Swiss-Prot record:
UniProt name for this protein: Large ribosomal subunit protein uL13
Keyword terms, alphabetized: Acetylation, Citrullination, Cytoplasm, Phosphoprotein, Ribonucleoprotein, Ribosomal protein, Translation regulation
Family named by the database record: Belongs to the universal ribosomal protein uL13 family.
Phosphoserine sites (modified residues): S77
Lineage of source species: Eukaryota, Metazoa, Chordata, Craniata, Vertebrata
Top-level taxonomic group: Eukaryota
Subunit structure of this chain's protein: Component of the 60S ribosome. Component of the GAIT complex. Interacts with EIF4G1.
HAMAP family listed in its UniProt record: Ribosomal_uL13
Transmembrane segments: none
PANTHER family: LARGE RIBOSOMAL SUBUNIT PROTEIN UL13 (PTHR11545:SF3), RIBOSOMAL PROTEIN L13 (PTHR11545)
Length: 203
């Protein structure tokens, strides 16, 4: 059986519910999905309202034994994971298997920092929300309700961006050198190029 291709999504700039709905559908269909930069996910509505909603949710607990649940996740990645879980039949075998196919991260840890990340246009804030509408960042909400790693994640992101910049600069330099090398030998290999073209090996 062929290996299932992993779909790596960049959560930054996406709306929470819309992205969760698309991810839920994909994992049910059998795709493996990884969502990175969950702290950059947006929620429609102003920040204060969203915070009040979450604080109301924090008050929901089992009076006699709060350790039995419901569990209130503080990390943005876990808040997103819980949102997706609510869209899956997670108490069935099929739903549990679908949830196992989902991975969520704050920031972009290795090996996903070297992989191509995708966006979902149908869930992007700039596409789905009017420019005048207010929105909140999931990272800020999580930080204000008890997530302790906002600063750590931000520092690691800065380091990753610096590394990526250096890598891209090197890549551009190599491409420039390759182009120059091709130009230098263009006249020398002209006759071979023509032969290859006549045999249909070069277009």
């Amino acid at each position: 059986m062929a290996e299932v291709q992993v779909l790596v999504l960049d959560g930054r700039g996406h709306l929470l519910g819309r992205l969760a709905a698309i991810v839920a559908k994909q994992v049910l269909l059998g795709r493996k999905v990884v969502v990175v930069r969950c702290e950059g996910i947006n929620i429609s509505g102003n920040f204060y309202r969203n915070k009040l909603k979450y604080l109301a949710f924090l008050r929901k607990r089992m009076n006699t034994n709060p350790s039995r649940g419901p569990y209130h996740f503080r990390a943005p990645s876990r808040i997103f994971w819980r949102t997706v879980r609510g869209m899956l039949p997670h108490k069935t075998k099929r739903g549990q298997a679908a949830l196992d196919r989902l991975k969520v991260f704050d920031g972009i840890p290795p090996p996903y920092d070297k992989k191509k990340r995708m966006v979902v246009p149908a869930a992007l804030k700039v596409v789905r929300l009017k420019p005048t509408r207010k929105f909140a960042y999931l990272g800020r909400l999580a930080h204000e309700v008890g997530w302790k790693y906002q600063a750590v994640t931000a520092t690691l992101e800065e380091k990753r961006k610096e590394k990526a910049k250096i890598h891209y600069r090197k890549k551009k330099q190599l491409m420039r050198l390759r182009k120059q090398a091709e130009k230098n030998v263009e006249k020398k290999i002209d006759k071979y190029t023509e032969v290859l073209k006549t045999h249909g090996l070069l277009v």
